[in-house]
Amino acid sequence: MQRGRLRYASRRESGLRLLLPGPLRAAAAVLLAACVTVTIVLGVHIVGSSLPGWLDSAFDPRIRASLSRFPTLLDWLPDFGTLGPVALMTLALVAACLVTRRWSGAVLAAFAVPVAVGLTEYVLKPSIGEAIGQAFPSGHATGMFALAAICAVLLVDPPHRRVPGAVRLLLVLTALLFAVAVAAAMVAIGAHSFTDAVGGAAVGAGVVLACALTVDLVTSLLRRGPAARPASDG
């Protein structure tokens, strides 16, 4: 009976793995603080000025000039940041986590993206973005960088590490570059400015980091229960 309880507790604990290893939690907290700071600084600047900032004046023309040579890309890249594709990619991440029994990862993917998109569309845009026609932060950038950040969190410390570290790093960089490409395409077609894209990236990544740290905290509490129960029963 005792052995069965220990086996059950071990299986449950393996399914409730922490998303971020210990040394990376402090780094995640620092990155989260940076994302919050960037969002606040850009938001305050936008509210206090109706004119384009020096960042937009410096980067927007360069981005548009660089990407104007690729009209085909500009036709389909922005579509990936719309609600439908973002929802499908989110469901794919949730399904992958469920198949591999990464319950914490499934919770992260299921909640972080909707929270990030909802924060952008229903809180930040109506309040901060109202000064510039509700363009800040970019919803496309928010969704894509949230997905990229989730990929990074899921691949940083997978359960069995069957995928080599170099391949995992390449996958994360690919996800980040794809997010950058979608955000840049929105700037190139004039739908957003560089500031909007940076703000969306900060919101998307920041929400994912906040959710990952919260999920890990809850997971740690849940893992303590099964570990302590057999000892108390004996």
Model region roles, listed by residue range:
Residues 39, 114-123, 177-187:
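Aromatic-anchored segments of alpha-helical transmembrane domains
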